[in-house]
């Protein structure tokens, strides 16, 4: 089993066609076919089911493709790090973020990388914490920002920020960032919240139980843009971190107020897989995320406590 065979396996598995893989790799079809046959002979089982419309991975083939992708990625990272040792950062980084963080941070981070490290290829994954953890464990994600993760032996965790949540209402409600709202007062609000698997919903409901406060949730949406749109249409109020709505508050379409007694807060962390070395490009992403978050805190765009 060699690097060339694994690369061929990955491309045929992705394209489902020997001819398409040959065109992509600029290698003759018979040569690719011999590589796959050699792999199958070595392993002792078919890696593809062959039919008139192409080639489909078997269960063994799918498993080997997953491992091969990790190997090929590590080889590329090693090459990029060797080049980067001369001071020029290059390579690729897959960064995972919860939706509320992605809307706040991804654009800023992408611009900074484009300006400072144009040879780094970034890919962003926006998903819930459970999916991001799975991506880290499977090595599909290099670095993730997570909310309040439970202890995971497979992850290396670095605290980033303790974030405050705010009541967000239409602009005409005239909520003020200088006039906090009591948590129990939320019982009088028509609330629009994310679904039950979202960390904001879980946190709000936890504090509601602790405060013996009954909330009136009339609509659910896991999309940040939908929640903001619904609030601007005066369908109700929601609960979000301040950076999510900072621009809307400046424009006057939304207003917000801190929540107290108790104050719902979430802890954000940076996470990487413990069984994987951090590439130079990934380490640079860690540094830039910390820098961007610190700048937003200093400008009162992101309200919270740096950790």
List the model feature ranges, each with a label:
Residues 42-43, 64-86, 299:
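Alpha-helical linker/hinge and terminal dimerization helices associated
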Residues 176, 190-211, 278-287, 293-304:
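Secondary-structure junction motif
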């Amino acid at each position: 089993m060699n690097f060339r065979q694994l690369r061929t396996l990955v491309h045929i598995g992705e394209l489902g066609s020997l001819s398409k893989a040959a065109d992509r790799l600029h290698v003759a079809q018979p040569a690719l076919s011999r590589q796959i046959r050699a792999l199958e002979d070595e392993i002792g089982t078919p890696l593809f089911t062959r039919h008139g419309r192409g080639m489909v991975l078997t269960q063994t083939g799918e498993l080997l493709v997953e491992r091969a992708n990790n190997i090929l990625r590590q080889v590329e990272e090693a090459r990029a790090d060797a080049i980067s040792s001369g001071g020029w950062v290059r390579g690729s980084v897959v960064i995972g973020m919860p939706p509320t963080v992605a809307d706040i941070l991804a654009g800023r981070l992408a611009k900074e990388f484009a300006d400072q490290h144009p040879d780094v290829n970034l890919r962003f994954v926006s998903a819930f914490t459970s999916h991001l953890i799975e991506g880290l464990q499977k090595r599909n994600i290099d670095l993730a920002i997570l909310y309040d993760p439970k202890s995971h032996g497979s992850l290396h965790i670095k605290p980033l920020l303790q974030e405050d949540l705010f009541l967000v209402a239409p602009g005409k409600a005239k909520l003020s960032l200088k006039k906090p709202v009591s948590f129990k007062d939320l019982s009088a609000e028509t609330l629009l919240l994310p679904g039950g698997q979202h960390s904001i919903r879980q946190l709000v409901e936890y504090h509601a139980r602790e405060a013996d406060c009954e909330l009136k949730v009339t609509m659910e949406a896991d999309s940040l843009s939908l929640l903001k749109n619904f609030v601007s249409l005066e369908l109700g109020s929601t609960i979000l971190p301040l950076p999510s709505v900072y621009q809307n508050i400046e424009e006057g379409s939304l207003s917000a107020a801190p929540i107290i007694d108790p104050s719902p807060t979430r802890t954000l962390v940076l996470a990487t897989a413990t069984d994987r070395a951090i590439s130079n490009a990934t380490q640079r992403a860690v540094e830039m995320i910390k820098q961007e978050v610190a700048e937003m805190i200093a400008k009162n765009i992101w309200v919270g406590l740096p950790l």
